[in-house]
């Protein structure tokens, strides 16, 4: 048991939920009490003076592709020089290049490539990260990616949630045969992943260049049979009704949503599905149509913010910068951005005991060299993290 005293606490219980001159009583991995320090119940627990610093829940990055091999820097240069998507692909770039590099990497090599990315996230105050498969597109590599993600959670003080994203793209060896790919690779891999305890949710990419709503509906039906929750990349490049599809399947989240329409907004609101906004991909792809944040806000749809860390369209590993981008590019408020990387991000992962500072919640905390929580979205640059607690222990 211990006390953190002399804090400004943003509980996220009601807006920022700011409590000045606050203390937090922690027992084991749980918060037992939070409030004005003058009202702290008598306790013999040791007290740590935090010097008047700001305390928030540890941040949650609820959408990443952090396990992969290789880079896509060469095609970045090609695109800047005017190369089309087809020209990049013909030169060996695009998602296929990441798939080939990831397939060729051993588990140890994937782990060695991924850990520095995770370490950078943790240095920015992240305490929970979602990691997807999706760069194997064969049974062996999809499972290897998920095993590496689980290993990361064992090696670092971070909570890792995994999403099986076998339906990310159709690999070259199944070009023109997406149904066969789903039947022969995706569904068998999903079953093995579930049997091995490697998967927390099932994800898919609903887009003309990926999978149709009907194909995804079939995949989600199989996920439900395995008692696995679902989430969906939807309405990023066009509107295929992916958000409404996600809502019909009680998805935890629908992600991207640049081309979301009024029907999709209403469906998300009715289902309680979280809208995950990914400003890094919007920025890197130089998109011009932003998600309909005002409509989502008016409908009461919870909005999360994530990095979408991946080598092709969002090589962004700093969640604080994603918060700034969400405010600057999508017009979220700093309060919404913080909620989007704490309580709403937790909801997008199906987690109900992190993302707020309240009795009974896990003691996943970030203590910052900051006076006000708006500073976390205002800053462009290194996160002002002082120290992080993971399940009640200083990291």
UniProtKB/Swiss-Prot annotation:
SUPFAM superfamilies in the record: Composite domain of metallo-dependent hydrolases, Metallo-dependent hydrolases
What InterPro entries is this protein classified in? Amidohydro-rel, HutI, Metal-dep_hydrolase_composite, Metal_Hydrolase
Q: Which reaction does it catalyse?
A: 4-imidazolone-5-propanoate + H2O = N-formimidoyl-L-glutamate
Q: Which residues bind Zn(2+)?
A: 63, 65, 233, 308
Name the GO cellular-component terms: cytoplasm
Pathway-wise, it operates in:
Amino-acid degradation; L-histidine degradation into L-glutamate; N-formimidoyl-L-glutamate from L-histidine: step 3/3
Q: Per the annotation, how and in what number is the cofactor bound?
A: Binds 1 zinc or iron ion per subunit.
Localization (cell): Cytoplasm
Chain residues that bind Fe(3+): 63, 65, 233, 308
UniProt KW keywords: Cytoplasm, Histidine metabolism, Hydrolase, Iron, Metal-binding, Zinc
Asked if Transmembrane is a keyword of the record, the answer is: no
Binding residue positions for 4-imidazolone-5-propanoate:
72, 135, 168, 236, 313
Instruction: Write down the superkingdom of origin.
Output: Bacteria
Molecular function via GO: imidazolonepropionase activity; iron ion binding; zinc ion binding
Required co-factor? Answer: Zn(2+); Fe(3+)
Which amino acids does the record list as binding N-formimidoyl-L-glutamate? 135, 310, 312
Matching NCBIfam families, A to Z? Answer: hutI
Family assignment? Answer: Belongs to the metallo-dependent hydrolases superfamily. HutI family.
Q: What does this protein do?
A: Catalyzes the hydrolytic cleavage of the carbon-nitrogen bond in imidazolone-5-propanoate to yield N-formimidoyl-L-glutamate. It is the third step in the universal histidine degradation pathway.
Q: What is this protein called?
A: Imidazolonepropionase
> To which species is this protein native?
Cereibacter sphaeroides (strain KD131 / KCTC 12085)
Gene that encodes it: hutI
